[in-house]
């Protein structure tokens, strides 16, 4: 077994905790799927490499070890001195590889929140987290106390501050801020919904077809409102730091080094899903068959998304790469920039004119012409065309039945939040009640101030060091289209640069465009 990953509460800082979580993520990571880190595929893992340990200490003389199953990042056991304790649902091999040479005991409860909460006689929302809770838990485990209620409560603290924090940037950030400010916190509705949907989000990403989840995942924001996630390009996906391994994408290039027998055992994602969804784009409008007319050659337009799901705004993403409404195909009239897009009978249309690929970044491209779906007109009813791909905001799309903007605050360097001030934007102390800190993230990739959704975050020029300001969205420019990535960056596709707090100095009151360095002044998080 590798050496344990260590964290001490003594002299702990938000920085020492951040380093601990990063080391843990690194140890748990198996590979990347859709550019998002994923736990190892269990079929490629030998049983003896299945477990890792984390050492949590209050001082040189007071420490415990926690055993984690790398296939699911679950806490399966802990050791205090010469005694170790295994959860009831720990895999049978856990006791063969973890804490051998100690007296091994079985705990009376499972590692699920439902069971732990029953034994603790408290829900997760009632149990405070933070440095003090962790320090207390380490001391209690180390003392060998026999109170099962307290054991369950302590495990709820450790699981969330260690395992859940490794899975989600949102959760590690909550813990980090609590260490920074020296205050305890109780999990909010967003945090609980992430914990409860980790497997659903992981499955959605890995089984996604044409940038779209087979089934929508319903998260909750801090105001207890539903947030529906059904696309890889939904900004909430960027809070995932590690996914559960579900399956390999059907077309994944299998490494030739993997032994054939292992590859055959390994689970490949089904490609049978053909989701039927809306396609949201420019200004949050929907791709719409004009006037509900399904005769060949009728144009496809942008129209406001209807309150109810209606046929002429519903599209089935077929495995043959066609996109169909009412059984007919989304078809480009030609292969030259400016060709209009129409509805057409799939069997009589030129096949290549009906094929589309939806990229993870929200681009919809016709492979034959290499042109992309574009909403050139900002007015409702404007006809869709294919155009040269320039990653313009008017060429950004997000599939899913919920195409409404995701409203959130955005935290960044030094745990400050992005704040609108007239046409400027800078960093200020976070206050979730401040309208100037609320941002609406649209289907077209734009980031808009909720105070005036006609204003978009825009980089002033296409060059390194350009200031980011609020400018009219009606331009639909490339400098107004952003991607929230899992490395924490807010990325401009056209410029291949990211949002950066200038000079790591918030007092300069400037956010600029800069090449990605991965430094803290380029790391952002949607706070739900």
Curated annotation (Swiss-Prot):
PANTHER family: PTHR33453, RIBOSOME-INACTIVATING PROTEIN. This is Abrin-a. SMART domains: RICIN. Signal peptide: none annotated. 2-beta repeats lie at residues 453-492. It comes from the Eukaryota. In the N-terminal section; belongs to the ribosome-inactivating protein family. Type 2 RIP subfamily. It comes from Abrus precatorius. 1-alpha repeats lie at residues 283-325. The A chain is responsible for inhibiting protein synthesis through the catalytic inactivation of 60S ribosomal subunits by removing adenine from position 4,324 of 28S rRNA. Abrin-a is more toxic than ricin. Keywords: Disulfide bond, Glycoprotein, Hydrolase, Lectin, Plant defense, Protein synthesis inhibitor, Pyrrolidone carboxylic acid, Repeat, Toxin. InterPro entries: Ribosome-inact_prot_sf (IPR036041), Ribosome_inactivat_1/2 (IPR017989), Ribosome_inactivat_prot (IPR001574), Ribosome_inactivat_prot_CS (IPR017988), Ribosome_inactivat_prot_sub1 (IPR016138), Ribosome_inactivat_prot_sub2 (IPR016139), Ricin_B-like_lectins (IPR035992), Ricin_B_lectin (IPR000772). CDD domains: beta-trefoil_Ricin_abrin-like_rpt1, beta-trefoil_Ricin_abrin-like_rpt2. Residues 273-400, 403-527 form the Ricin B-type lectin domain. Glycans are attached at residues 361, 401. Pfam families: Ricin_B_lectin, RIP. PROSITE patterns: RICIN_B_LECTIN, SHIGA_RICIN. GO terms for biological process: defense response; negative regulation of translation; positive regulation of endocytosis. 1-beta repeats lie at residues 326-366. 2-alpha repeats lie at residues 414-449. The keyword Disulfide bond applies. The B chain is composed of two domains, each domain consists of 3 homologous subdomains (alpha, beta, gamma). GO terms for molecular function: galactose binding; rRNA N-glycosylase activity; toxin activity. Its EC number is 3.2.2.22. 1-gamma repeats lie at residues 369-401. Disulfide-linked dimer of A and B chains.
């Amino acid at each position: 077994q590798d050496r344990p990953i260590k964290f001490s509460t003594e002299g702990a800082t938000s920085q020492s905790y951040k380093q601990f979580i990063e080391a843990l993520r690194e140890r748990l990571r198996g590979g990347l799927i859709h550019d998002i880190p994923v736990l190892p595929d269990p079929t490629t893992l030998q049983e003896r490499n299945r477990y890792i340990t984390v050492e949590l200490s209050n001082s040189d003389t007071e420490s415990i070890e926690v055993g984690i199953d790398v296939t699911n990042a679950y806490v399966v056991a802990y050791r205090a001195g010469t005694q170790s304790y295994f959860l009831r649902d720990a895999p049978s091999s856990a006791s063969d590889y973890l804490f051998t040479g100690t007296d091994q005991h079985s705990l009376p409860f499972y590692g699920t929140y439902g069971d732990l909460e029953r034994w603790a006689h408290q829900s997760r929302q009632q149990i405070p987290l933070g440095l003090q809770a962790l320090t207390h838990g380490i001391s209690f485990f180390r003392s060998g106390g026999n109170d099962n209620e307290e054991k369950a409560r302590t495990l709820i603290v450790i699981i969330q501050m260690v395992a859940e924090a490794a899975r989600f940037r949102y959760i590690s950030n909550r813990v980090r801020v609590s260490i920074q400010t020296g205050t305890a916190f109780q999990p909010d509705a967003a945090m609980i919904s992430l914990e409860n949907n980790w497997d659903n989000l992981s499955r959605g990403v890995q089984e996604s077809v044409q940038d779209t989840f087979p089934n929508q995942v319903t998260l909750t924001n801090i105001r207890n409102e539903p947030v529906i996630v059904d696309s890889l390009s939904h900004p909430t996906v960027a809070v995932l730091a590690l996914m559960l391994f579900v399956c390999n994408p059907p077309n994944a290039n299998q490494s030739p080094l993997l032994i054939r027998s292992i590859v055959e055992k390994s689970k490949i994602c089904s490609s049978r899903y053909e989701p039927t969804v809306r396609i949201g784009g420019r200004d949050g409008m929907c791709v719409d068959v004009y006037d509900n007319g399904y005769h060949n050659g009728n144009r496809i337009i942008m129209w406001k998304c209807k309150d109810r799901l209606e046929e002429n705004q519903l599209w089935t993403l077929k495995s043959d790469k066609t996109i169909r409404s009412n059984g007919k195909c989304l078809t480009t009239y030609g292969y030259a920039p400016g060709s209009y897009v129409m509805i057409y009978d799939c069997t009589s249309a030129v096949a290549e004119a009906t094929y589309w690929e939806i990229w993870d970044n929200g681009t919809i491209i016709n492979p034959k012409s290499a042109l992309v779906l574009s909403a050139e007109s900002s007015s409702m009813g404007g006809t869709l065309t294919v155009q040269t791909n320039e990653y313009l905001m008017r060429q950004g799309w997000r599939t899913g039945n919920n195409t409404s903007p995701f409203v959130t605050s955005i935290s960044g360097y030094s745990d400050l939040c992005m704040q609108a001030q007239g046409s400027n934007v800078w960093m200020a102390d976070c206050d979730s009640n401040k309208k100037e800190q609320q941002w609406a993230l649209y289907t077209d990739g734009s980031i808009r101030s909720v105070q005036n959704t006609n204003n978009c975050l825009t980089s002033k020029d296409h060059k390194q060091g350009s200031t980011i300001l609020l400018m009219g969205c009606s331009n639909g420019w490339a400098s107004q289209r952003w991607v929230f990535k899992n490395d924490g960056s807010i990325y401009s596709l056209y410029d291949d640069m990211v949002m950066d707090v200038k000079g790591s100095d918030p007092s300069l009151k400037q956010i600029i465009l800069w090449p990605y360095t991965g430094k803290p002044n380029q790391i952002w998080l949607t706070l739900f």
